[in-house]
C-alpha cells in the first residue's frame, strides 16, 4: 500500500535566507521522512509591520538560489503572489487543494513561535489541518516551550513536535546589520545569496528597494 505524501512547509520572511534555515529544514526532513520541504517566502506578513521588509521579489529569488542544489527542497510563490496580509491558514488550505486531502503537512517553525501559535489566525482550524514541528537548538531553555507544547497537545492531540537541530548562531537580523556596516557575511549563507545581496546592494543603510 502506497504511503501518503509527506510535505514540510517552511515559511518565513527569509530576509535573507541563511544556513540556519537550510540546516533546520534538512534536519526536519530527515527526522520525519518528508518527501520534500517547500520554502514559502512570506508576502506581507502581519507580524513584521514594525520593520521594513525587503521586496518580495528579492527574497523569493534569494530563497531559490539557496535551495536549488537540494533535490528535496522547493520554493513556492504562493504567499508573495497573494494580495494583502498573508496568513498560514490560507497557505495550508491552498496546499491542501493542490496536493489533496490525504497529503500530510508539517509546518516547520522556530521554537519561540510555539508560544504564539494559539494567537494565530484561525489557530483552531490550522492545528487540525497540519502538524507543527518546533525546531530548537541545544542549550536553549525549553521549560516554557515544553509547557506550551503540552497545552496544545491536551487541546488538539499529537499535532505538534519538537526537534533539536544543530546549533548555528546565525540570524537574518545579524546578517542585515553586518551588511549595513560593511562587515563580512561569508559562511553565514550560501555564496549565490551573498553575491545576489552584493549585486543588488541590499541591506545598505539607505536601502529603498
UniProtKB/Swiss-Prot annotation:
**What pathway is this protein a component of?**
Cofactor biosynthesis; NAD(+) biosynthesis; deamido-NAD(+) from nicotinate D-ribonucleotide: step 1/1
Q: Which InterPro entries match?
A: Cyt_trans-like, NadD/NMNAT, Rossmann-like_a/b/a_fold
GO MF, one annotated term: nicotinate-nucleotide adenylyltransferase activity
Going by the UniProt record, its keywords in alphabetical order are: ATP-binding, NAD, Nucleotide-binding, Nucleotidyltransferase, Pyridine nucleotide biosynthesis, Transferase
Please, which domain of life does this record's source organism belong to? Bacteria
Report the catalytic activity.
nicotinate beta-D-ribonucleotide + ATP + H(+) = deamido-NAD(+) + diphosphate
Q: Which SUPFAM superfamilies match?
A: Nucleotidylyl transferase
Q: Which CDD domains match?
A: NMNAT (cd02165)
Biological process (GO) annotations held by this record are: NAD biosynthetic process
Instruction: State its Enzyme Commission number(s).
Output: 2.7.7.18
Q: Which NCBIfam families match?
A: cyt_tran_rel (TIGR00125), nicotinate (nicotinamide) nucleotide adenylyltransferase (TIGR00482), PRK00071.1-3 (NF000840)
Task: Write down the HAMAP family for this protein, in alphabetical order.
Answer: NaMN_adenylyltr
Chain's role: Catalyzes the reversible adenylation of nicotinate mononucleotide (NaMN) to nicotinic acid adenine dinucleotide (NaAD).
Belongs to which family?
A: Belongs to the NadD family.
Q: What is this protein called?
A: Probable nicotinate-nucleotide adenylyltransferase
| Originating species | Caldanaerobacter subterraneus subsp. tengcongensis (strain DSM 15242 / JCM 11007 / NBRC 100824 / MB4)
Q: Lineage of this protein's species?
A: Bacteria, Bacillati, Bacillota, Clostridia, Thermoanaerobacterales
Amino acid at each position: 500500500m502506497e504511503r501518503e505524501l509527506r510535505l514540510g512547509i517552511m515559511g518565513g520572511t527569509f530576509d535573507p535566507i541563511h544556513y540556519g534555515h537550510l540546516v533546520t529544514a534538512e534536519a526536519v526532513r530527515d527526522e520525519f521522512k518528508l518527501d520534500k520541504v517547500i520554502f514559502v517566502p512570506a508576502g506581507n506578513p502581519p507580524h513584521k509591520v514594525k520593520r521594513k521588509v525587503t521586496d518580495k521579489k528579492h527574497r523569493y529569488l534569494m530563497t531559490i538560489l539557496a535551495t536549488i542544489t537540494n533535490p528535496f527542497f522547493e520554493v513556492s510563490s504562493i504567499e508573495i503572489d497573494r494580495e494583502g496580509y498573508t496568513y498560514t491558514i490560507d497557505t495550508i488550505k491552498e496546499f491542501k487543494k493542490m496536493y489533496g486531502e490525504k497529503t500530510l503537512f508539517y509546518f516547520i517553525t522556530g521554537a519561540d513561535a510555539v508560544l504564539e501559535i494559539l494567537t494565530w489566525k484561525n489557530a483552531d482550524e490550522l492545528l487540525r489541518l497540519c502538524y507543527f514541528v518546533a525546531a530548537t537548538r541545544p542549550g536553549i531553555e525549553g521549560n516554557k516551550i515544553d509547557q506550551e507544547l503540552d497545552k496544545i497537545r491536551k487541546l488538539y492531540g499529537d499535532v505538534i513536535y519538537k526537534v533539536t537541530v544543530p546549533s548555528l548562531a546565525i540570524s537574518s537580523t545579524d546578517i542585515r546589520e553586518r551588511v549595513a556596516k560593511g562587515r563580512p557575511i561569508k559562511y553565514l549563507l550560501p555564496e549565490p545569496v551573498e553575491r545576489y545581496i552584493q549585486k543588488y546592494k541590499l541591506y545598505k543603510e539607505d536601502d529603498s528597494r
